Amino acid sequence: LLPAANTVIFFFSHQVPDIASVFFGQQVTTSQVIDLARDLLAEGITHARDALDWPDIKDTLERAAKDFRIACGPDNGRWSTQQLPTDAPLWAALDTLQETLGEVSRTIEPATVRAETLAQVAERLHGLMESFEQWRNHSIMSQGEMICWVEALTYSVRLNATPLSVAEGFTRQRESDHMRTWIFASAT
């Protein structure tokens, strides 16, 4: 939670369930893909300009992320995966985004030996691939432990996996902190 803190204070303890569900949940966004694409372009041009067509790689990643947002429809909104039909356009767009991440990963792999920072961006890419895959697996196999939902924002999409109960994770966190004091306060 906070590795160096001796005391954990919750001033609005009546909000602990809401906050904990976000804390113990998982999320991945298309904004992360776009940020990664821009970082990949900067590092690629700086350290391996002659290796690949970095602007094209950036554009490919950005296009896949933006197409995923477009597939969610023109309006902002939130939908649980249970509300979405299996043939909803966003599923195909998510598949395309995941395939694009995989293709880019394979394409840039030989160039990552040129600079540590380029290798670090490649590691972020692998982390994003894992996050999208984990969310997809949760959305298929959560069996009542988590609710997976899609949040379409103006320019991005956020995929969330939120536990239905935070009791176990919260208790585990609290019990692992033998040397900390926990204080809960609420005005309500």
Please annotate each region the language model reported:
Residues 1-188:
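ASCE RecA-like P-loop NTPase motor cores
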